[in-house]
Amino acid sequence: MKRALSPLLSIALVIAAGILCAQNPEKDAPYKNPKLPVEERVADLLGRMSPREKAAMLSGAGWMESQPNARLGIPAIKMADGPMGVRNWAGSSAITNAAATAPVLATAFPAGIGMGASWDVELVRREGQVIAQEVKALGRNMILAPTVNINRQPLWGRNFEGYGEDPYLTARMAVAYIQGVQSEKVIPSVKHFAANNQEFERHRIDENIDVRTLHEIYLPAFQAAVQEAGVWAVMNAYNKVNGLWCAQNPFLLSDTLQKRWGFKGFVISDWGSTYSTAATVAAGMHLEMPGGEAMRTWFAKPGTQKDGNGAGWLTAEKVLAAVAGGQLKQEAVDDATRRILRVMFTAGLFDNARTGGGEVDTPEQRGVARTASTESIVLLKNAGGALPLDASKIRSVAVIGPSAAIARTGGGGSSLVRPKYSVTALDGIKEAAGARVQVGYALGVSMQGDDASEVSPQARAHLSNQAVELARRSDAAIIVVGYSSKLESEGFDRPSMDLPTGQDELIEAVAAANQNTIVVIVAGAPVTMTKWIGRVAAVVEAWYGGQEAGHAIGDVLFGAQNPSGRLPVTFPKQWSDSPAYGHYPGENLHVAYEEGVYVGYRGFDKRNVEPLFPFGHGLSYTKFDYSGLKITPAKVAAGKQVVVTARVRNSGSRAGVEVVQLYVHDVRSSVDRPVQELKGFRRVALEPGEARNVSFTLDQSALSFYSSAKDEWVAEPGAFEVWIGASSRDIRLKGTFALTR
């Protein structure tokens, strides 16, 4: 006969069992076990969630956080704006053009266009890593970056955020940035999917783009982000593409992103870009932002949304109602929840949810920012070797202009970072010039939006006269002009390519007073220079260079650094030369991309239009020679690779970096193709007299076009030419090979 356990012993065993369960929660809840595969953890957690808990995952809890779940221990995804650094996330200040008011300080890197001008993949990867480190240090776990939209035309207000006009260059930079961010277990969200190429009516505009143009120009960076970098999140755009909002566009989200490319992460809406419940979830959009009170407060503001309410469609109540009413399948809700959880597990949010307490803006991070600022600078013109300035031979320098004594670290909108410090061009020039050189300063003209912009005509004339007189008595005049975060920003487009508020006239006046006038441009896109380009000695494109821009400008002007930047966009002589001219901003809320694949240099080549400065252009303080082009094999079978090798030699007297560019020309095609397309590039650092072999590998994708008829990429047999050069208009070597069947 068995003896019954005593009451005290029974209680003790129950307590012991409870302690063991508390010490080993993974036993009863496998999703908490970090040793299990991600998919097993996702499946276990998803199976424990109620329909309401699943539905709640599809909308945010506030302005910059997803919905947490206390019962199951699901943490919130905590977001921060990017891509040039960690942007403020506090309330509605996140979408103003002013610097963030909350005390969120982080390293400010150059704008994306400047990073594109570096043509330095490893540098961009390191930038992504540093930004991710600061995301974690500031208590967040997701960065809304990178921006990979193509610079279709020079007036777009967010040209500065992207990497330029070329899909190949943009894709290389996107992959590197994402790899850097994800290496730190921070969630990036590549944006804006797809074709966000103008701010004018961005909430309502319908963009009509043929399928070939989409696949060849506007989608490659996103495809590379998914298939090469394995990006964890994608942000949809505000606009419509071919009649459907991007947030509920099955062609983009379901057919292309998820089915064709195999995307396993989640799609997050741009803030206020959703217009339906069932159609949005069914199309493949998974997390609506913002949510909660932040959503209601923001979208209650007059004029915030001009075409219905762009948020509040994926609340738990609406999602459950759509499922109950038969408009939405539960499987679609499960898929959205599964995707969000998959990313959260992959990023370690369940296992190491604690963030904050790390360092921001460390000496090492500042060093990366300074390198980035330096490499972003492009020397556009250098007549007679006007640069670099020799501090041992000049006694005085005039520094003039509305952007000389103000650090314009970035363009406006959600990307503008508030750094702990910033270096102005004036301070950087003073430091680089040294104590022996007298550096004078004059404003010259005030820029709209600056404190002194509202001045009388008499005061404006006085400012200009002061600048001219300073230039006249100086050995060299450096005039720093351009745009600002209040004039070039998310939310609106530029009215023209012209420099604003009398800056052209100031340059002309200063150049007339000093033949050694150097123009430094601080902007995010090309500007018109035809009035004065022939009258100045040198032109430097500094973009928005981040917090270290001043140091970088000074170092380049005085020769401590040899400029190595190359243009990631074509600089037209005037706006009317742009391929998109006449097809922007559209009519009746429709814009037709009638230029097709002929964006940027492709369009200039097609129409044989001479640009002011071509894509890929950038001068150096040394010279480079090209020789020894080899292409093997001479005949390549479909699916095989071609190896291209060339020799580059520094034939000048100082060390420098050449950016060797490879373009492919299809000799004969069944469809009209661009004259040339960038398919490879290498940064090569060379000492004086040093030479190196540079190699490229071309696969079938480098030879292909997108066939609208076949709905697939096609590489046709025949002859192809390889063009190697220093820019799209400075080709040094040419060779031919054949693609066989």
Residue spans for each PLM region:
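Bacterial N-terminal signal peptides that target proteins for export
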Residues: 1-9
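Glycoside hydrolase catalytic-domain context in secreted enzymes
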Residues: 18-705, 712-714, 719-729
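Short beta-strand elements
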Residues: 730-741
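Bacterial N-terminal signal peptides
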Residues: 9-18
